[in-house]
Amino acid sequence: MIDKKKIAEAFGKAAANYDNFSVIQRIAGNILLSKIETFFNISILDAGCGTGWFSKKWRQLGNTVTALDFSKNMLLTAKNTNSADYYLHADMEQLPICDNIFDLSWSNLSLQWCNKFNKAISELCRVTKPGGMVVFSTIAHGSLYEFNKAYRTINSSYQENKFLSINDIKLSCCNKKTLIDNILITFSFSKILEAMYSFKKIGANYISSNHSKILTKKKIRQLQENWPYNPNGYLLSYRFVFGVIYL
């Protein structure tokens, strides 16, 4: 089971510098934006808003935005940058919101931290008006393959995070009319520590919380020998899934 308190702590620690390292979130969010039309003057829920990067984008278009996050520090960062109209510290699996409130519910790379993906999707559908949409991006099984492969060579007890399969994500979508798309994006880094640092600094170090915190020179060399590599550097892949649910 996912420990949401630890996740909130991990993202909270990353909040101050999150926007300097959140290239992955922005790439996924921009792809998600391309899946739908641009909306103006509607009510939007940004569920798992982080620092409010996309909340601010939606608000600048004249929309009324509610920014929601489970991390108080992330929400405070969003508030300090005036990203939204309203701010709500809450769990996506138990939204303290009445039915049929928002025209659009948006969640970018947050649902993978829920214990019950289908419950979170159901909640987003519940608070969205009939005729509205729930749009989301998430990470699917197969992500971080390179890290998992290499790390098991220095820690045989390491257990990777179990991201849902694409099919399981499809089955979680409330039996509604849904468009699902996915893409594998591979990033490259000049050093393996940079690759690991990239997901640590966006709060996602929780996924590797069961590995030892001290990497000796010997272990680093072993990681280098086993981490997939090409002329561009050490590789780290994410399987992104994008969903649009029509209500």
Curated annotation (Swiss-Prot):
Converts the free carboxyl group of a malonyl-thioester to its methyl ester by transfer of a methyl group from S-adenosyl-L-methionine (SAM). It allows to synthesize pimeloyl-ACP via the fatty acid synthetic pathway. Its EC number is 2.1.1.197. Disulfide bonds: none annotated. Pathway: Cofactor biosynthesis; biotin biosynthesis. InterPro entries: BioC (IPR011814), Methyltransf_11 (IPR013216), SAM-dependent_MTases_sf (IPR029063). The lineage of its organism: Bacteria, Pseudomonadati, Pseudomonadota, Gammaproteobacteria, Enterobacterales. Keywords: Biotin biosynthesis, Methyltransferase, S-adenosyl-L-methionine, Transferase. GO terms for biological process: biotin biosynthetic process; methylation. It comes from Buchnera aphidicola subsp. Baizongia pistaciae (strain Bp). Belongs to the methyltransferase superfamily. It comes from the Bacteria. This is Malonyl-[acyl-carrier protein] O-methyltransferase. It catalyses: malonyl-[ACP] + S-adenosyl-L-methionine = malonyl-[ACP] methyl ester + S-adenosyl-L-homocysteine. GO terms for molecular function: carboxyl-O-methyltransferase activity; malonyl-CoA methyltransferase activity; S-adenosylmethionine-dependent methyltransferase activity.
